[in-house]
Amino acid sequence: MSFIPIVCGMKSFDSSYDTVPGHQNLYCPNCHNYSVGPIKRKEFFTIWFIPLVPVFWGKQLHCPICNWRQDFKNDEQLNKVIQEQQNLRQKQPN
């Protein structure tokens, strides 16, 4: 009888959501940097490094510094976050 190990895990594929300059460099509530941007994320369960079953498929705001993430469903939610960010920047003292 032979023993064949089954290697399984998770693999994520991130891609840019868009290249609009207003959607980049948003404020991160976790690390307090202006580095958050929207991404499209696909996460799969893998066996032998082959993606088989999709676990997550959606859009997120992502900070590459601290790896903070927040889901958003559509452009309306994204624009609401951007509007709130602009309000924060206007209220900051110089």
From Swiss-Prot:
Highest taxon of the lineage? Eukaryota
TM stretches of this protein: none
Q: Tell me how this protein sits in the membrane.
A: Peripheral membrane protein
Q: Which UniProt keywords apply?
A: Cell membrane, Membrane
**Gene Ontology, cellular component aspect:** plasma membrane
Q: Where in the cell is it found?
A: Cell membrane
Additional information: Present with 996 molecules/cell in log phase SD medium.
Task: Say which family it is in.
Answer: Belongs to the UPF0768 family.
Query: Which protein is depicted?
Result: UPF0768 protein YBL029C-A
